[in-house]
A protein has these predicted regions:
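N-terminal beta-strand motif that seeds the catalytic metal site of vicinal oxygen chelate
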Residues: 1-19, 74-81, 129-130
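Short strand-coil-strand connectors
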Residues: 13, 47-49
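Short glycine/proline-centered loop/turn elements that form peptide/ligand docking sites
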Residues: 17, 35-39
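Mid-chain, well-packed structural core segment of small domains
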Residues: 64-93
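Amphipathic alpha-helical segments
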Residues: 14-29, 89-96
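A short, acidic/glycine-rich surface segment
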Residues: 31-33, 62-67
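Conserved secondary-structure micro-motifs at functional edges
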Residues: 25, 55-63
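Vicinal oxygen chelate
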Residues: 1, 44-47, 54, 90-130
Length: 130
């Protein structure tokens, strides 16, 4: 069901400072910057070997990322695993009583943090940054 770790999302207070730190310390480059009004954050994607680090700065304190920052401070928010059969994996998890958010027809799903000791787990097809 789970393949390689392909995403590590880190919640930060100041995305500009975090970008500077990750690029200076690790030699990473920003591949994409964006904003999700639906989920209440701005982000930056920094490709790594087989996946990427995603920096998330909340824009809405009432959405999940904002609540995470208020409760936990900065830190790891989500781990994304490569998954070749998302619909099948979602079905198996739901059969086991696991709360999973999957939108029909999308190649991504999320396991609720309460199911796995507070860690937000994402199932996704691997993105390549060549």
């Amino acid at each position: 069901m789970l393949g390689d770790v392909v995403e590590l999302s880190v919640v930060v207070r100041d995305i500009e400072a975090a970008i500077e730190r990750y690029t200076r310390l690790f030699g990473l480059e920003v591949h994409h910057r964006g904003e999700s009004k639906e989920f209440g954050f701005v982000n930056a994607i920094l490709p790594t070997g087989i996946g990427h680090i995603e920096l998330l700065q909340p824009t809405d304190p009432d959405k999940a990322v904002g609540k995470f920052l208020a409760k936990n401070g900065e830190g790891v928010y989500l781990v994304g695993f490569e998954c070749q059969d998302i619909p099948g994996s979602v079905a198996r998890l739901r059969e086991r009583g696991v709360r999973v958010d999957h939108r029909e027809g999308k190649d991504i799903a999320w396991v609720h943090p309460r199911e796995v000791n507070g860690l937000f787990v994402e199932l996704r097809h691997r993105e390549r940054y060549d």
